[in-house]
A protein has these predicted regions:
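Solvent-exposed serine/threonine-rich low-complexity stretches and specific carbohydrate-binding patches
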Residues: 15-27, 152
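Histidine-/acidic-rich catalytic cores in large beta-rich domains
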Residues: 2-10, 27-31, 42-215
Length: 215
């Protein structure tokens, strides 16, 4: 594969997501990364790609049917909780911004699992604030087109792997940097870990910003 164009076919009345995939991203992911699938839905994805085969370059087109599973998370058991994710209510959209995507970082409701521990020190940090993350990308129709499945990196039973996720930045390479509790991390939108590190011991907890340096 030399390059690719991807189009996620929108639901009826929905918002199209279409993008180009560079050669470097094809090599990084070992194939075509697909972004913007509707959760718990049978998506149609159109892929147009250039490939070199036996010395010849040709353009090919494929249409894939891809079911994406439902949004996942840790339910709190609170009586007011009606779903694992909040709903977006779109009031008005300007036509020139109709193709925009919005990154939203929100907080879930704590439950018994997330409230087991606290630093045994009156000068402790943010461990008390054990809100599970609700981090999504929504389109201008209010549909969730990406969500952070935090279950593999945010562990309520581990005091060094939980805490409020904050300070999200999208870097020039497209990857996200952020911090939570005793950690700071960098992942791409496909869920590939670049790094996930403990804070130095001199820090109490992560709060609230993480600014990537020029290098």
């Amino acid at each position: 594969l030399l390059d690719a164009d991807v189009r996620v076919v929108p639901k009826k009345g929905g918002q199209e997501i279409a993008y180009k995939v560079s050669r470097s991203q094809l090599l990084t992911h070992g194939g075509v990364p697909v972004f913007g699938l509707y959760a718990d839905y049978q998506n149609q994805v159109e892929v147009t790609a250039k490939k070199r085969f036996k010395g010849q370059v040709e353009t090919v087109k494929f249409i894939y049917t891809i079911y994406a599973g439902p949004i996942t998370g840790i339910p709190s058991g609170a009586p007011h909780e009606k779903s694992l994710m909040f709903k977006a209510n779109v009031k008005k959209v300007s036509k020139k911004f109709a193709d925009r995507l919005y990154f939203v970082n929100n907080l879930g409701t704590p439950n018994a699992q997330t409230m087991r521990t606290i630093w045994n020190n009156p000068m402790g940090g943010a461990m008390t604030w054990q809100f599970p993350p609700k981090t999504v990308i929504i389109d201008t129709k209010g549909e969730i087109r990406w969500f952070l499945d935090y279950r593999d990196l945010w562990k309520p039973e581990d005091p060094y792997s939980n805490g409020v996720m904050m300070g999200f930045h999208q870097n020039p390479d497209g990857c996200l940097t952020f911090g939570f509790g005793q950690r700071y991390a960098k992942y791409d939108l496909m869920g590939r870990k670049i790094w996930n590190r403990r804070l130095p011991n001199a820090y109490a907890d992560f709060s609230h910003a993480l600014d990537p340096a020029q290098n």
